[in-house]
Amino acid sequence: MSKLSDRIIQVLIRKDVSIHAQLFRFMSLLGTIAMAVGGVYTLAEGMEIKNVAALFAGALFMGMLFWAGNKFQQYDLCSFILMSGLNGIFLPVTFLRSGGLKSGMPLWFVLGFISLFFLLRGKSLVAGTVITIIADAYCFYTAYVHPERITYMESESVVYVDIIVSAVITIFLTCAFMFI
């Protein structure tokens, strides 16, 4: 098992590539694993098949980005695609389907916004920031003006667990970004 972890660390943390490339590798690999595990969990819980399909499609997409970044050394482009997909599509859809403001989703929005500044630079950072602000504003507008479009969680205890889990993951990932 230690050989596998050593190999993963060698792939993620390499001194021959930029810090942006290392962060991209970390985020895309971790995202691939997290979405695949989420897909298996969602399938095991018997939730809607479209949620399972979305998680597996997201895992495949992030895995392909990880592969393309490593293969073609286009880390800036792959990072922009990753952040645009995360902040412009995945997080807003998840916000609408997972409780909106009455969940841990606002913490994920913060993580998505912070990640922009770790991964992007120059015009990509400006474009990513604009995409993120528009997507977040749309979500908050929808939650305020059309709360009926939000799928809320079934109980208050589930909301609290979601907020705690989101806080722990957000803190862990932010610290990990700073470590790399």
Predicted regions and their residues:
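N-terminal membrane topogenic signal
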Residues: 13-28
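Alpha-helical transmembrane segments and their interfaces in multipass membrane proteins
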Residues: 14-17, 36-60, 73-77, 97-103, ...
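Alpha-helical transmembrane segments
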Residues: 25-35, 80-89, 132-133
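Membrane-embedded alpha-helical segments in integral membrane proteins
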Residues: 30-45, 65, 90-91
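Generic transmembrane alpha-helix motif of multi-pass integral membrane proteins
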Residues: 63-68, 89-100, 109-124
